[in-house]
Amino acid sequence: MTYQEYLEKVKLAKEWMRAYYEDDEPLASDEEYDKLIRELKEFEALYKDKISKDSPTQNIAPTIQSEFHKITHSAKMWSMEDVFDEAELRAWAKRAKCEFDFFIEPKFDGASLNLTYENGKLISGATRGDGEIGEDITLNVKEISNIPKIIPYKDKIEIRGEVVILKEDFEKINEKRAKDGLSLFANPRNGASGSLRQLDTSITKERNLKFYPWGVGENSLKFSKHSEVMEFIRSLGFLKDDFVYCVKTLDEVLEKYHELLEKRDQKPMMMDGMVVRVDDLKKCQELGYTVKFPKFMAAFKFPALEKTTTLLGVNLQVGRSGVITPVAILEPVELDGVVVKSATLHNFDEITRLGVMIGDSVSVIRSGDVIPKITKVFTQRRDGLESKITKPSLCPECLSELLDEGAFLKCQNLDCKARLVNSIIYFVSKKCLNIDGLGENIVELLFKEGKITNIESIFFLKYDDFLNLEGFKEKKINNLLNAIENAKKCSLSRFITALGIEHIGEVAAKKLAQSFGFDWFLQSYEAYVNLEGFGEQMAKSLQEFTKINHQRIKHFYEILHLEDEKKELALNENISNKTFVITGTLSKSRDHFKELIESFGAKVSSSVSKKTDFVLYGSEAGSKLEKAQSLGVKCINEDEFNALLGGDDEV
């Protein structure tokens, strides 16, 4: 890198930094920013006499300019040095002259906050800002329910931590913003930062923010270890994460890092790494600071879940209901060990809202099994060669005219090949009839070869139908035919779900099966609309579907061996007609407990309210458990749940 190139990169890094800190509108992904900073550090390590005073490596953050008043921190809020692999971790430990007694905890991906208490009262809350001066957001901080307003400690103390939005709350916030025509938050961190900097405190309150402490600023505590400090802070009424450890060696640090990385998707909030610090406070004081970082701590970063790539084009997919879904075709990029080549664009309203064009640089996020999606478009990088994404008027599969319903486009041709194939794929999927070995590619092959023409034809497949198909040998054919035969025996509710009736999901299907049994498709509009949880839209959809498919359902009854769940309903006076919410990690799948609860005449809801009777919780329960406790809802673990089923009224 030449000196001129270095100065250009400094200028770019400053621009990205200002957009991130001042505008809450990032111009680059975290990975791109980290890469740029590392390039600057490499140059500066070689040419110490040429380091620019404007380099972000020499500063924590830009000077604050906002509508909020400024607060000077009593003690500086430092950033952390990032390490990205084992070699860098060991190099950091060597510089810190420490290879034992480390304190480790998750590095939550949120907004840093400094709380000041005097005489046991919260007197101010401020953002990190440039490390010395932050924004006064005290009124908003007081709307965060898990931040104590009064603590049992009289001396002045600055308590620092991270404000986060839980994943489930983040999705709800973005759904609401989309409905209101507002731009979406790119990630929970931006959501947390934006929520703290609201002029209307009621908005902050409704965002359900959480605060997790990670350290202290000014204080008069007499502890000798950071772990003791944090134990004391949490005893004052602050949240503690369940992944906090003191370990002896770097090998143990690495072991815990990989353990936490495996739990990444299970955590209710986003994490971007693990904090590693020297536990001995005297040793920390001796090590001191660089111009930007404490020498005694580092952020051991996780692989990025969000990266920047290029939108190459858009494919149009036809779903089983005829809805056209635009899918972004991307320049391949690796995210969390998976090569991502496409991302959902949901619908054409979303394309308009994003303002995305073919050729744009876009930010793509992937978490766990969630379908990758585009969260941001970097319009500043356009070069004029981009092209608009046009809304089609004809079905891409059958070329019939599309029905334009605003956000959604629909193919109304019932014989459209794509609709038929996707209906079959859905029918045999895991949550429906769960026919092992009959995946998407095989369904498409069988349809293409004329071996199946509709859902029913699956159950009439014979050995000879597979003989000339590529990849099929005797064992594979027999396994698939056995799986099809075994799938004929299933619950009535799974069958109803598998039919793919618009607005009728698993919960509604279970309700229909339990309420009406095999006669579920013979009911009136009034009978449907009067079911608990059913509305006019669901009742209308059911009535239209059953009217058209009356004889077809009877034909399925002749083919399949369905279990009548109406007869299986065994009422339990402890839980019958009660409402449950399930949260956290339990000994078996959530679906197992859901089916068990419903089999005893109770129902399972996805959200906690005053009408909730029980919250069944496991390890790492999130905001649902906290909300239930605040509302006085009875919260039970698995042992207590089993006691309920056994008729124990003492629970």
From Swiss-Prot:
CDD domains: BRCT_DNA_ligase_like, LIGANc. The active site is at residue 107. PANTHER family: CHROMOSOME TRANSMISSION FIDELITY FACTOR 18, DNA LIGASE. It comes from the Bacteria. It catalyses: NAD(+) + (deoxyribonucleotide)n-3'-hydroxyl + 5'-phospho-(deoxyribonucleotide)m = (deoxyribonucleotide)n+m + AMP + beta-nicotinamide D-nucleotide. SMART domains: BRCT, HhH1, LIGANc. Pfam families: BRCT, DNA_ligase_aden, DNA_ligase_OB, HHH_2. Its EC number is 6.5.1.2. PROSITE patterns: BRCT, DNA_LIGASE_N1, DNA_LIGASE_N2. Residues 570-651 form the BRCT domain. GO terms for biological process: DNA repair; DNA replication. Its cofactor is Mg(2+); Mn(2+). Keywords: DNA damage, DNA repair, DNA replication, Ligase, Magnesium, Manganese, Metal-binding, NAD, Zinc. One of its GO terms (cellular component) is cytosol. Zn(2+) binds at residues 395, 398, 411, 416. Belongs to the NAD-dependent DNA ligase family. LigA subfamily. It is an enzyme of class 6 (ligase). GO terms for molecular function: DNA binding; DNA ligase (NAD+) activity; metal ion binding. The keyword Ligase applies. The keyword Chloroplast does not apply. SUPFAM superfamilies: BRCT domain, DNA ligase/mRNA capping enzyme, catalytic domain, Nucleic acid-binding proteins, RuvA domain 2-like. It comes from Campylobacter lari (strain RM2100 / D67 / ATCC BAA-1060). This is DNA ligase. DNA ligase that catalyzes the formation of phosphodiester linkages between 5'-phosphoryl and 3'-hydroxyl groups in double-stranded DNA using NAD as a coenzyme and as the energy source for the reaction. It is essential for DNA replication and repair of damaged DNA. NAD(+) binds at residues 30-34, 79-80, 105, 128, 162, 301.
